[in-house]
A protein has these predicted regions:
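Short loop/turn motifs enriched for small/polar and acidic residues
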Residues: 122, 157-159, 308, 359-366
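Gly/Gly-Pro- and Ser/Thr-rich, intrinsically disordered tail segments characteristic of DNA damage-repair
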Residues: 1-239, 383-420
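DNA-contacting surface of Y-family translesion DNA polymerases
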Residues: 2-3, 10, 194, 204-353, ...
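Acidic, metal-coordinating catalytic segment for phosphate/diphosphate chemistry
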Residues: 20, 323-420
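Short, charged/polar surface micro-motifs in flexible loops or helix N-caps
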Residues: 14-16, 46-49, 310-313, 366-369
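Short Gly/Ser/Thr- and Asp/Glu-enriched loop/turn motifs at secondary-structure junctions
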Residues: 112-116, 157-160, 254, 298-302, ...
């Protein structure tokens, strides 16, 4: 089946965290050195030198500093590396400003993470008008640089996959095209690990059978790929290596609305039995929602916690994460935070003497996982708090197990159990 020609842009911020930290520093002290011009990096604890690198400057890259490596190792490579802490509020501010600019060019805008988005500009620029696409890409880059102070790369193609690959070519502040006829020259020579959607384990399996470049995968027998990787993954790698993708740019308003689960209780829950009766239920509902998301191949960004009172009034709280998720642990942690606000806060329902009979957990602002990558923002937060979360998880799991045993003992075996 032929692919439909579209005019697709992928806009990606160059060294997003580092650039945005540099801009804030210059705003606060115009006489300071621009972090982007010296060996510098974002991540970890600046005082203790613990943690990992979440972003680096181009000068730091020349010393071999890599995103994701321990701060200690980065300092061994570059002893004079300037470290700055993460500043998530600043990152949110610049991300929102960027998306506001991009939304002026087309309503067909799909934000993929805090620092990147796809735009379908077919209604504005015909697919055959490739010169016009280059002009518009330059306009977007200039507008972002002049109005916001940082640079972006723009990848242009007829589908999302190739536009994404193009934006990862030479940086910073560049426009690159990767049309289907350019794939053999521009994409096939690249290492197989550079193929978007090909993870480390998949790439390693392919190397073991002599597939080292994207071109090798493109020309490999489909049966071989499916034997090594499985039917679905093998077909995906085969299509991607040949530049084939039919994933559409999906604005929020066109995405599925939500995935949620709720449960009505046979008893009222108030402050006295919240710990023993509500927490295991929130755990179970979060796992069920995560399971449904994973089965549907979806991830969401907004988590909602809702309850119904004994008088049948509904109350809810929701928050939008900085990343897309389908993970039960993240959904549960967010739901527990919202539950605490709604029920136990100074103006919470329990403080007002309102008990509850129904609990629900939901995730909305959904997108297909096929073209969704882990948000850099969330990845940074996760790495910075990784050890703390691991320790807390053990204690929480033990507590939850005890709670589930207790509630099952009170209301009968199987009342609450771990979601499948």
């Amino acid at each position: 089946m032929e692919q439909e020609d579209r005019t697709i842009f992928h806009v990606d911020v160059n060294s997003a965290f580092l650039s945005w930290s540099a801009l804030k520093r210059l705003e606060e002290d115009p006489g300071s050195v621009d972090l982007r011009t010296i060996p510098s990096a974002v991540g970890g604890d600046v005082k203790t030198r613990h943690g990992v690198i979440t972003a680096k400057s181009i000068p730091a890259k020349k010393y071999g500093v890599q995103t994701g490596e321990p701060v200690v190792k980065a300092l061994q490579k570059c002893p004079h590396l300037v470290l700055v802490p993460s500043d998530f509020e600043t990152y949110r501010k610049y991300s929102h400003a960027l998306m506001d600019i991009l939304a002026k060019y087309t309503p067909l805008l799909q934000q993929m993470s805090i620092d990147e988005a796809f735009l379908d500009l077919t209604d504005r620029i015909r697919p055959e008008d490739r010169e016009g696409a280059l002009v518009l890409a330059r306009q977007i880059r200039d507008t972002v640089r002049e109005q916001l102070g940082f640079t972006v790369n723009v990848g242009i193609s007829s589908n999302k996959l190739l536009a994404k690959m193009a934006s990862d070519f030479q940086k910073p502040d560049r426009t690159h095209t990767l049309y289907p006829e350019e794939v053999p020259a521009k994409m096939w020579p690249l290492p197989i690990g550079d193929l978007y959607g090909c993870g480390k384990q998949t790439a390693q399996k392919l190397r073991l059978v002599g597939i080292n470049t994207i071109g090798d995968a493109a020309s490999a027998d489909l049966v071989l790929l499916q034997t090594v990787l499985g039917e679905r993954t093998g077909l995906h790698i085969h299509n991607s290596a040949n530049g084939i993708s039919r994933s559409k740019v999906t604005p929020e308003r066109e995405q599925a609305k939500s995935v949620s689960n709720e449960r009505t209780l046979s008893i009222d829950i108030d402050r006295d039995n919240y710990q023993t009766d509500a927490l295991p239920l929130i755990h179970m509902l979060s796992e069920k929602v995560a399971g449904r998301l994973q089965k549907a191949g979806l991830a969401g960004q907004t988590v909602t916690f809702q309850v119904k009172s004994a008088d049948f009034d509904r109350y809810s709280r929701q928050t939008t994460l900085s990343n897309m998720t389908d993970r039960a642990e993240e959904i549960e942690a967010t739901a527990l935070y919202l539950a605490d606000q709604l029920l136990n806060g100074p103006d919470g329902l329990f403080e007002k003497g309102i008990s509850i009979r129904l609990i629900g957990v939901g995730v909305s602002r959904l997108t297909e996982k096929q073209m969704q990558q882990m948000d850099l923002f969330a990845w940074a937060e996760q790495n910075e708090q990784e050890e703390k979360k691991r320790q807390a998880a053990k204690a929480r799991q033990a507590k939850l197990n005890a709670m589930m045993d207790q509630i099952n003992g009170r209301f009968g075996g199987g009342t609450v159990k771990k979601g499948e």
